Amino acid sequence: MGTVTTADPHASFLADKGGKVFVAGHRGLVGSAILRHLVSLGFTNVVVRTHAELDLTRQSDVEAFFAAELPRYVVLAAAKVGGIHANSTFPADFIAANLQIQTNVVDAALKCGSVRKLLFLGSSCIYPKFAPQPIPENSLLSGPLEPTNEWYAVAKIAGIKMCQAYRIQHGFDAISAMPTNLYGPQDNFHPENSHVLPALIRRFHEAKASNAAEVVVWGTGSPLREFLHVDDLADAVIFLMDHYSGLEHVNVGSGSEVTIKELAELVKEVVGFQGKLVWDSSKPDGTPRKLMDSSKIQEMGWKPKVPLKEGLVETYKWYVENVISAKK
């Protein structure tokens, strides 16, 4: 800890595997995947801190950490996240914590003088509620946000703008990536605030375990959604760190859509639930379509690799081995 390796100062990210990389938020869905990916690629100097070890909302602590560690690269995957209920109940917590984390990390990364590149991870919720489909990068700030999570979205938009401002004023190589709906190991399977895919995995597993006759899912199943395995996002993060240096944020999606009905049938098959799948069409469907336009990163040469079914099999295996076994 605290040492700086002497690697080629002109090397690309992938050629600089001894350069110190700070992954902020390494215990979450995204950060843990990035950490796994860096280690598998042979990066030997990855620095992480738990929240107990480093509270990213405390400016003085963050500045002291950067001054001591002098990382060469930063991936900012740390954020305060939660479901619709949490966002609507604690809006001040969400906007304040996320603004503090972003401001402290980006500013300390510039001031410590050692950081060559920083990547900030946002969310597809930054886009207007009625954005064109597929959603291009330039639809940012073109209309009102989805009210249910606007506090989180506004903070993430501020993060993008902060990276842009630091690039314009200081020449700091800070870039931003906006992933679509993610899933995979380390996902949140909580009954009250999990997203649709882990929620379906949990519900079908519980129905299978209790020999339930049916699983009832809200809506008609017709809305179209896009899902990206978190390992593909980790791969895209490494790709952007190595290939991209620009002002505009970059969308990262799978580019393929699936209806909620198709998704539910696939999860049912993967879990091995033998009962009926029932749709409660009296309940709302939500937005009819949500797809990111990821042509920009794909034109640079990046493509996702994990097919949805393969990713679901792996995610269900992780759920059984880590979430279910932990309850026994």
Curated annotation (Swiss-Prot):
InterPro entries: Epimerase_deHydtase (IPR001509), GDP_fucose/colitose_synth (IPR028614), NAD(P)-bd_dom_sf (IPR036291). The record marks 123, 125 as: Important for catalytic activity. It is an enzyme of class 1 (oxidoreductase). It comes from the Eukaryota. The active site is at residue 152. Pathway: Nucleotide-sugar biosynthesis; GDP-L-fucose biosynthesis via de novo pathway; GDP-L-fucose from GDP-alpha-D-mannose: step 2/2. The record marks 156 as: Lowers pKa of active site Tyr. Keywords: Isomerase, Multifunctional enzyme, NADP, Oxidoreductase. Belongs to the NAD(P)-dependent epimerase/dehydratase family. Fucose synthase subfamily. This is Probable GDP-L-fucose synthase 1.
